[in-house]
Amino acid sequence: MLPGAEIEMLGGDCFEGSYEDHQIFREVFFGSDPGNTTKRCLVTGAINFECDSSKNVNSSLSSNSVVTSGYACPQGFEASASRDGSDFNTKAKRVKLSGNKHLDARDEKGSALHGFPTSDIARETIPLHLVESSNKGVSTSSYLLKHSIVKGREVYLGGIVSGKCKSLNLDKCDGKEFKAIASPVSQESFATRMISVGASTPHSEKACFPLQLNNGSKVSPNELIMSKTCLKIDPKEDPRPLLYKYVCKVLTAARWKIEKRERSAGRKHVDTFYISPEGRKFREFGSAWKALGGILLADRKLMDTGTKKWTGINDFWSDLSLTLLDIEENMKNLNLANTRALWWSALEPFVVVVFISKQVGSLRKGNKVEVARNSNPDKLKKEDTICLNLISGCPESVLTVSEGSHLVHDVDANQEIHSDLEVQTKISSQKVSSRLERQSIIGKEISGTHEQEASKGIVASKLIAEDMHESVMRKNLHRRSKKISDIKPASLDQHDSLDSNSLNSFEFQDKEMGNIHLVSKGSRDERLRNEKMNNSCCNSKKGRKKARKHYTQDDDLMGSTITRNKGKFSRSSQKKKTQKPKARTKKRNNRGGCRLLPRSSSNVENHFFQGNWSILGPRTVLSWLIATKVISRDEVIQLRDPDDDTVVKTGLVTKDGVVCTCCNKTVSLSEFKNHAGFNQNCPCLNLFMGSGKPFASCQLEAWSAEYKARRNGWRLEKASDDDPNDDSCGVCGDGGELICCDNCPSTFHQACLSMQVLPEGSWYCSSCTCWICSELVSDNAERSQDFKCSQCAHKYHGTCLQGISKRRKLFPETYFCGKNCEKVYNGLSSRVGIINPNADGLSWSILKCFQEDGMVHSARRLALKAECNSKLAVALSIMEESFLSMVDPRTGIDMIPHVLYNWGSTFARLDFDGFYTVVVEKDDVMISVASIRVHGVTIAEMPLVATCSKYRRQGMCRILVAAIEEMLMSLKVEKLVVAALPSLVETWTEGFGFKPMDDEERDALKRINLMVFPGTTLLKKTLYESTKPSTMKGVCLSKERNNPSNKEADLEPGLDKAGSPMSTQVESCDQMVPAGSDDEPSPGFPVPLGADQTEPTSETENPSRDSNANDRPNKTTVVSIGEEEEEECLQKDVSKLSEEGKETTRASSSSAALEEVSGLGLGVVNNVSDEMLLCVDEQLDSDSSQDSE
């Protein structure tokens, strides 16, 4: 210790800190006892730990002394301790041990560090004390200097201990000198309330402040037994038992079980199993811990998702002790889900370090350990954190880069980091300042050098980072990292210099050499454009073959990368100038389409625990509404009389149904309506919640949330070169070298189209051409000229189909190429939402999603929309339970929701408009689901069929398929096609009667837009045997279709060689039929749904019944261009359609809509109820959505 005289000299002339000040302080707090016979404070009663050899030495007032402190109060340390160190305006000094200095140290200003012994008394342990008052009460501090200090440790000097203090353990010292670094209290972490001291200290046990625990805490035999009065934590002890104790408490609070089982005979080891509340067993602790976190954090967002860092075991124990104290104080609230989630998040970093990554040994060595909060942090955020640490140049870390060359790109922040990056063993940041305005970054090149050339280090200009929260690293540093000083110099391959335009961002990208380049974003875009121009100039054949460019990870190598595989990139053209260019093709790619894969039963549980649905709950609309939190359990539901709005029945909503108050039975929602005397076969408009809110409004509210989530969940991924074409074949769904359509994004394999050579000139796919003349049908043409059939989706020229320029005004815009498509369309639309009872209490119904059009509709249509869309959301859960998610790599579209919600797309392969969903239910519980799409009367496809896991192997799928086949046969659909997995081909063929297709039938289907999956097998089943020739063969074997050149017709359609009108045989998708049959096509024009009957097609037209309609001669229908014959054919068609309207009305008498309009002739197509208008509006919505896309 320093002599008292020297201490007085250090005090200066100021009174504060002088000997007199210290004497007054001692008299106030310790009385005027001259001999200091008592060691208890007069104010607080705290014991003075000062030893006899240091009582009258004025050294404890120095702010640079080692401090251990605590608050004195009658209830103990924990009751009065403050957890916020910011309440005290104190400062501390951090002492970092140096290996080449003595304990007789001085700080940067040359002042001696008070409180440290010289080397001759370094082996003594000198306790000092200090009692201070503050707004929190009176605090006492005990200053301890042990006989040794460990080299490389950090010691905090001075200040009042707060709730975030670091524990001090001053171990052996080699007589080295300290280096003191002043820092404010708010920027340092402090010792915990319980201070550990060495065993050699005489008053170590008294100086230790106990870590108080609740008296009610129970400790199981498998956990660490803790003392109720004092817990002495030694950083060198194993932290696993203590941490495991609290982990077990969190698991037990979450209703998990921990079982120990002995291994087989002869082994003394015991296995531990962690069992979830659902009965799932985990052998590994890490998997159980992550599963617990996934359940607790499923519906919650934690604010703290950063990282935690510790340097040494002392720092780790300091943070852990505070966390455990907080958990112990709030242990009684662990029965709350929010509290369990909070404490799981608090313990997660410690559990990862101790049990999962097992880095305790690294902490004991004094190394720095960093761990992310939560187990599954976002990958991009993780990359941002790594790159920010690299750029900021932390003093304790070294900026490392990959062996590859990098481009720095994409930094946008509200703070700027001025850093001089010097190529040495360490790159540090010199200055960090915040700024709101955006700055520019001048690109400079930094090349790595050897250590011998470190003095010549190339220094980059100021590196200004903007918006640290955005991504600053777009490529993973996945190669072996090394210091910049170890990277050998390398030169650029093609570009000697980089543009110095302003940068908006940085980008790290890889190259085989070890350079870092700072490049401007503007120059990068300009260089890309130049590369494209150069490539187009170099290729002798411009635009012949469209290939997706694969950019390398260095823009300076862009040119060489784009032109790799040059043999496949472009097709050499012949030198003949008269030869027409070939059709465009795409370079071979391996992306392809999505494969149909079933979900294994072991992954089903994990899939549904991550979402809102529970696999154990029933698949009903009520259960879905409860899961979406639109309605709550035990909420009152009422059935009211539509006449006087009086309550007829009342019940309580549960997950299993409705508890009827009159009979106290749990029934389904349909039985509840039937119990009240209402028809359960149609949407109920008089069903209300207890709050007065209509039940249909609750369904629409839940559907709105589902619609937004699904629509916003997918994104359109554009190709790197803005290639608009698809990456998958429209026939087989696989990738490869593809032929591009010149009108739409569709692409095809040449072999799938059965083409021997590429067609010359522009080439158009079947979705863009007329099905009669095979010429392009423009989407921008007026509806009166060209149109698309609303049922089979085939396109036609108006002149090709009817041969005349006269057309009727159509409202709404629903077109048909023939009466067969119209009958199929009306038959399916009239069955939407209708419940068809079956045996054993089962029922089936057809559903179709009603799009969001923003229009005002009738209450009946809104109720039907709410019912159908809600059931489709439930059906989607069964599909997702049965199949793995199929996200298209080109567009990002999740195909299964798009199929069930019949959403359209600009990509023909992903255009699922026209799909219907057929479901089988029992007591409102959905059992089986199938998606179907009917392409006229030619063929219907059923790509997806699924059954709820609870009802599998009970024949439910067979009941569903039988209902679909019966419905299609009533609509006279010829064939049903399924895409079968290889493992289920035998089941479909032997159990359901399907057969493989021959080559001719597969070729006939190539023009039809089927939903196909790579690796599946197409199977067919004949449903309706017609007397007409095979429409499948007739459709695709016409003369024009077999000519792939798309040459112009020699003669104008409808005219002979002399240019006069001629008789033209109609060849629509369903018109190769004998005359006089029920399947006869409409003569002269496509029949629209809802045709305006107030405007006749001619003055002499008078719709009347044709009594001899069935006595027509059996010959092929020929349309005459003459005016009189046209009017006569029109009258016959109107008369026949009137009778068919009555037959259709009688067949679907269960629909209230058709009952209202029976007997109205052709008006049955126009004056229909809300169900029919719904289908029309839906078609309009689909068209508008496609136009918007």
UniProtKB/Swiss-Prot annotation:
A GO cellular-component term linked to this record: plasmodesma
Coiled-coil intervals, chain numbering: none
Subcellular location: Nucleus
Phenotype upon changing residue 942 to A: Decreased acetyltransferase activity
Effect caused by changing residue 941 to Q: Loss of acetyltransferase activity
Gene: IDM1
Main subcellular location of this protein, as a coarse class: nucleus
Pfam families: IDM1_C, PHD, TDBD
Assembly information from the UniProt record: Interacts (via N-terminus) with IDM2. Interacts with IMD3. Part of a complex made of MBD7, IDM1, IDM2 and IDM3.
Name of the molecule in the record: Increased DNA methylation 1
